[in-house]
Amino acid sequence: MAERANLVFHNKEIDGTGMKRLISRLIDHFGMGYTSHILDQLKTLGFHQATTTSISLGIEDLLTIPSKGWLVQDAEQQSFLLEKHYYYGAVHAVEKLRQSVEIWYATSEYLKQEMNSNFRITDPSNPVYLMSFSGARGNASQVHQLVGMRGLMSDPQGQMIDLPIQSNLREGLSLTEYIISCYGARKGVVDTAVRTADAGYLTRRLVEVVQHIIVRRRDCGTIRGISVSPQNGMTEKLFVQTLIGRVLADDIYIGSRCIAARNQDIGIGLVNRFITAFRAQPFRAQPIYIRTPFTCRSTSWICQLCYGRSPTHSDLVELGEAVGIIAGQSIGEPGTQLTLRTFHTGGVFTGGTADLVRSPSNGKIKFNENLVHPTRTRHGQPAFLCYIDLHVTIQSQDILYSVNIPSKSLILVQNDQYVKSEQVIAEIRAGTSTLHFKERVQKHIYSESDGEMHWSTDVYHAPEYQYGNLRRLPKTSHLWILSVSMCRSSIASFSLHKDQDQMNTYGKKDREILDYSTSDRIMSNGHWNFIYPSIFQDNSDLLAKKRRNRFVIPLQYHQEQEKELISCFGISIEIPLMGVLRRNTIFAYFDDPRYRKDKKGSGIVKFRYRTLEEEYRTRAEDSEEEYETLEDEYRTREDEYEYETLEESKYGILEDEYEYETLEDEYGSPENEYGNPENEYRTLEKDSEEEYGSPESKYRTQEDEYGTIEEDSEDEYGSPGESAEEKYGTLEEDSEEDSEDEYESPEEDSILKKEGLIEHRGTKEFSLKYQKEVDRFFFILQELHILPRSSSLKILDNSIIGVDTQLTKNTRSRLGGLVRVKRKKSHTELKIFSGDIHFPEEADKILGGCLIPPERQKKDSKESKKRKNWVYVQRKKILKSKEKYFVSVRPTVAYEMDEGRNLATLFPQDLLQEENNLQIRLVNFISHENSKLTQRIYHTNSQFVRTCLVVNWEQEEKEKAGASLVEVRANDLIRDFLRIELVKSTISYTRKRYDRTSAGPIPHNRLDRANINSFYSKAKIESLSQHPEAIGTLLNRNKEYHSLMILSASNCSRIGLFKNSKHPNAIKEWNPRIPIREIFGPLGAIVASISHFSSSYYLLTHNKILLKKYLFVDNLKQTFQVLQELKYSLIDENKRISNFDSNIMLDPFLLNCHFVHHDSWEETLAIIHLGQFICENVCLFKSHIKKSGQIFIVNMNSFVIRAAKPYLATTGATVNGHYGEILYKGDRLVTFIYEKSRSSDITQGLPKVEQIFEARSIDSLSPNLERRIEDWNERIPRILGVPWGFLIGAELTIAQSRISLVNKIQKVYRSQGVQIHNRHIEIIIRQVTSKVRVSEDGMSNVFSPGELIGLLRAERAGRALDESIYYRAILLGITRASLNTQSFISEASFQETARVLAKAALRGRIDWLKGLKENVVLGGIIPVGTGFQKFVHRSPQDKNLYFEIKKKNLFASEMRDFLFLHTELVSSDSDVTNNFYET
């Protein structure tokens, strides 16, 4: 009793580790038997307590954490911000992944801490808490997944899945989370089974390799050892673990006193003495040399001293112990156990977080900026790296705090920034090298959309290898994928494309372009337009060779009302032959799909076209030449399209008026046609003075082929136009439609039943009254059939038929009326004119081609009723007799039309010529769309209204406008754009090709106004002219590209710079903007919407792509923070940053300063320039930028961005592809190589252990090691000679690889908290590395080249023979090592039985049955077993050799030091391992 009273009473809980310690203490003190007795008592006690407590576990014991909701929300917010940064191109994919992992990891860890405290406070006796935290079952991580959050998963390859599982198992997972969980955590029964099988197979292979290793003798007499020293950063715990149970290889001295002798085994007492000695004199202490299985000299077994103490008791291992099998099982068994651990923890990612420095209080932070340099954190955020220790002061209101930041830390705040209390100001980089936990991983980034690849100037254009497409990035830069949609076109239409064709497509991307498909083609010298073939007809002469320098710019138009994707009309801008626009020239066509006739009625269009009064003549021969060449052009392409060529040119030039007339065929062009009148005209006089204030003018109609149609386009257009002084010309096109289509004429009900004669007096009167300001379009019904020549007609020419008469075998008429048949070369045209026929009495008094208005009463008819419709009177001759005329009265439909609109200042002039502003007027006219004359007809539509832009200007004197295509080049970037200028002098603009032609003087220091209607050309960036010199045009540039680029309107967004800028130089009167809505440009981009532009010039930098910093003028005294903390400042060419006075504007060309009045700027203006890439949401002006992209059109009050997706790529990343290459969605863009923390999960660990054992390790060697081996090869053979050099070289390699392999394997197990003694691993590694391969270069009589032999055997053979044997170290995997043993029976029982036995038989191998397995197979007695002491006689030769070495003291100690030196040399490599067993 008294004894018990003196005992110390410990009242504390005991967990797993405490129990382990207790048992090991008991064994040390009392031995095995007594310990097992005590443990039995413990077991009984435990069961008794557990039964009485009767802990049960129910689902309501799983208490969830209340704070989880907002923690998860916070993390989600952070990762959402991260997504946005990635989208803007601010961080790259790896940084995004890394940061998102850390965000969720930190959240998960924090939740884990919350969980512990939550349990402790709310329910300390909770069974889950008791169970997991006592170590009885489960651990904190598993409970965390039950009640906290499952967190991040890693997939079977060990890569992170960056979508975390936010739920816990108590709440239940959503479907997505469940799938990720199954995939990542590998929870299936199958998987556990497979893992267990893997672990079992690993155990089997390990045992197979080492089953024959037995402790056979006491001492092998080796003089080698491995040094262990705590100096190299080895932890004390590890140091103790390494030393205990080992045998010393050398005496240990402290000072002159020997404290331990060679061959003494190390116990706990000795280790403590070592540690105290090291602590007392850390630098003078010598390393401790110990013996390991690696140094044992025996080939097929191991000696007692090299193995050390037995793992079970504190004495040397007994002779006859099968240490090999023990080793194999010790390593394999934890694997089997650990596979089951995947049940909950499997796949959950764990990482580490850095130490943070936080601010002590609110205040302004200051540090010396010269001591830091800017860098980028691993999350892609800007930071400063300090080289040396940095003092940071934080100035609060009354106190000055000083914080010391260690070197190599990251400072996360700017100088002079205001920081809040507890804000993170720096991150301390961990001092220890975490190399071992990292692995290099490739991550591929794939393109998210089709596009064209661009990169900034930081990427080398030359690929790494000559023909490859891989490029290394020298520094961090952006890659941009400019949005583009690809158009794969059929072969026929592909021949039409030239370089820099610009097209519009909508609809499906991969649809082939049919002949009338929905895409405009615009070419640099031949221009094609397939959306509405009518444009093609009117511009067809652009194909002529003569018109080489015409250019067409179609402007896109987007209609919200219609259900089509985008219906667009092109505005085709033409520049005439000489580059001079006369007044009233049509230079643009405007095609509006809304005026298509939906119900396919046929008919003739008749319209009037008014022009200004001035008259222009041009040489008639010009026109004739054009048409001749045209004819050739068309005939060449007859296989694809059939055209009717121009039969004859008809022009009328009269004295004070001129007319536009089109030709009888389908392809008349109304633009600039002048010629001699060849027709007979009847004129109808009209008095127009009161309306126009102009002298009397006439308008004429051409006989016999026309009707007229009037169209009301006011409400369609939405804005009435003002009419200017105009006259009339006529323009006519035949309407040809295919007879196979069924047409219903919507106007059939409007045919008047009974009409009286129209007297000529009436016609003269009424024609004067309806000439209002609104022009009229008339649509006259007629039916047209185009029949093959061979078809037999059932009706006669000039006969009158009723509705639904049979015309040919299978066509019937839909209208009744007069039939006219016209036979042409390839086909027959059959026209049916509806209406009544009248035979007038006096033929001379009837005028053909009159329109009778509806209100007009017929003079000689008895009834006087109002007519509802206009009718059209047409005079016909009958059979060419002069007396007989008849008149057909045909019902027409009238449309009113909105007259031309004024597009003043579409092209503003330079400021000096501001008064000469060019007026562009809009005029609508009718054209008719024709089908192809082949059997396949894609669509036939009547096109009602075309709009023309007419150049006219207000001055009295007759001006000409110089229109030219301006080419501006800066640093080999060439841009073409249209420039229209009023020039007094007529300069011939047609020079030789590639000539720098003058386009009129550009005033000094003014921006070139030409960039207003610029259109984008591929791979060229527009820039402005740099010097006040003449700028010429470079036309007809031919380059071949392999593929077409189409930019649709959806890829572009427009940003307005100014809402309402007032400027002293601006034009005083503004014309209201014409609502042609936003007109989209050639690539679907908005080119200058037709409206006013202010004439001020803006800050534009030229030819400099700023990706990071944007400059802007700040005039409202507000600070717009553009990107990060860049306050208003300018950067000049030398990259100096100067603060900016808001009154100074920088002229980018001559760097002069202009002083601008303060009130002239109303909004902040960013300096933008063409080709600049802008990221989304950059605050350049009041409206944020909605999309990332490249600016490719800069207008006076807006600019257009081509949508682009930025990707950030860091140094060392590899770019796939070439600059400007077209990429498709899913193509590989960039390959990042980055280091990532290895997932420290045993389920990744086990395969890794297996990889190492199978010698499939992927880690590269340390560069230091290579250098050392080189030094070794230089010096050592000189000292020792070649044989020794080979021996020691192989030794060195093997020793090095052995040590690192042991460390790698230990690291995996230790990470799981599994303690395996190094000796077990060493025994197996010794077998894996004990072979060398005989190399080919030395001919040897003993071994054939390529043969695998044991290292010791090779050494002995080399010593025995005089000749040297050349061999190199080789690392076998455990499977190959099992198949390369000395016993073929053992090999055959492992794998490939037949092959192994057959080979052994052929070679006559002898099996000496030394191992366990072969004896088991053959049923013999196994040669192991402890408990017998057998004395082994040393052979006298061996003994003599040993003593001989002993006697040669000098050589022995030198040699021993040398061998120790080389192991130490290798092991002290700090990059690989500080010593052999460091983790």
Curated annotation (Swiss-Prot):
Biological processes, Gene Ontology terms: DNA-templated transcription
Cellular location(s): Plastid, Chloroplast
Protein known as: DNA-directed RNA polymerase subunit beta''
Pfam family, one: RNA_pol_Rpb1_4
Main location: plastid
Acidic residues bias locations: 622-631, 704-717, 731-749
Glycosyltransferase keyword on record: no
